[in-house]
A protein has these predicted regions:
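Hydrophobic membrane-insertion alpha-helices, especially the h-region
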Residues: 4-22
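A structural signal for short, hydrophobic/glycine-enriched beta-strand patches
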Residues: 21-163
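Non-catalytic accessory segments flanking enzymatic or RNA/DNA-binding domains
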Residues: 5, 186-188
């Protein structure tokens, strides 16, 4: 026999358990879902993102969630101007950053039975948003499909450290259910 075959078998069995009934099951479900998107999630912070989200909502007749977007008065004006029924739109102002865009909404989406979401954000922000979103939303079995919004000529490539930092923050949230950033800032 090949040395170490027993430990390899144990590792394979543990991975099989983790991805079928264990803690990785929601991630597997999110990655394998074939359902069409059921919501459009716009990460606020840029008016072009909101406009693209509104156009998608009109074209696809999907509900729209804007997280941390423009002020409520301007957002309401955009909705009226686009002719979108306000009952199809949620304006959510709980988020303070990319991480909380997801953590403040993911349980609401899961409760509503949402399994697949179009994620609208600027093309330079999309890689970090997808890193955080895949972890946070994936932990609830929700798949994300990114919709990049052109940001030329004002695009600025985000630093890899920022993406990794937010990714670690999201992973810690998935494991503990808490945002550990305040604790880390106090203790490091």
């Amino acid at each position: 026999m090949v040395p170490g075959w027993r430990s390899s078998l144990v590792i394979l069995a543990a991975l099989a358990w983790a991805s079928t009934t264990g803690p990785l099951k929601p991630f597997r479900q999110a990655l394998t879902t074939v359902e069409p998107p059921q919501r459009i999630l716009v990460l606020g912070g840029d008016l072009d993102r909101e406009r693209v989200g509104l156009r998608l909502a009109q074209q696809l007749e999907l509900p729209l969630v804007v997280s941390g977007g423009s002020n409520p008065e301007y957002a309401q004006w955009l909705l009226r101007d686009a002719g979108i029924d306000q009952s199809r739109v949620v304006l959510d102002y709980r988020a303070k950053d990319t991480f909380t865009n997801f953590t403040s909404l993911v349980d609401d989406l899961k409760r509503d039975g949402v399994r697949h979401v179009y994620l609208v954000t600027s093309e330079d922000h999309l890689p970090r948003a997808m890193t955080v979103g895949r972890l946070v939303a994936g932990s609830r079995g929700i798949r994300l499909t990114g919709v990049p919004v052109a940001c030329q000529p004002s695009c600025r490539k985000e630093a890899l450290g920022k993406r990794l930092g937010d990714g670690m923050r999201a992973l810690a949230w998935v494991i503990t259910g808490r945002d550990l950033k305040p604790w880390a800032l106090r203790n490091w």
